[in-house]
Amino acid sequence: MLVPHRVGAAEPARAEARELAALAAAKGCVLQVGHVERFNPVLHALEAQLKNPRFLEVTRLSPFPNRSTDIGVVLDLMIHDIEIILHLVRSPVESIDAVGIPVLSRGEDIANVRFRFANGCVANVTASRISQERVRKIRVFQENAYLSLDYKNQSGYLLRLAREDEKESSGLGKLISLATDSKIVTDFSGHRIVREPVEVEKGEPLRIELESFLQCAREGLKPRVTGLAAADALDLALEITRRIEESDPRRAG
């Protein structure tokens, strides 16, 4: 709902999304859309390390819900990762390969999508609501570095090529142990690889989101998730849903 004073909004329907964004701009209102994962401290830590990502692997798994079963997992869960990916890659989508399978409901309960972007980046995204555990992870491959981050635990680590000073000071290492949080320099096929934790200042994403909105409203700042950014994610999510529905063999005949 949009009123003359500043207001937050849940994800609107497609027919209303861009109209809502345009109306907010015309009225000088601050419109922020509730993609709460954008306010996870993990994402802030990731952006500090991000340099021209080439491949993203995103996984979001959840137990079967007692709500939102009237929509598929793309609109229920994956849309949050779609919005994040568009924000991180910042390049037009050139192609979409999507598959989705209904398991316990009429819509897709598990879906996998591969995006190819104009700048050459590829993103592989999996969302499922048929899982015994909650998993929310993002992995980023970029030049000379790999990042693995966990939204749920607000933790992560970085693998990168060693700097010259690290090459000189370190001895010959063993294979990297992913169970430790300490900095390790490893010799691997003639390359020195450093594994180190990603510093995450932990916090409650919903609280951060609300505080961010209030600050934007008070100071007239641009929201982290604008109406247009959310509309772009919604358009893409609905296109994925359409392709999954059209490929459903139950529609044949």
Language-model segment annotations:
Residues 65-141, 151-153, 228:
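Rossmann-like dinucleotide-binding domain that binds NAD(P)(H)
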Residues 17, 39-43, 81-82, 207-211, ...:
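A general structural signal for well-ordered alpha-helical segments in protein cores
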Residues 103, 123-208, 226:
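NAD(P)-dinucleotide binding in Rossmann-like oxidoreductases
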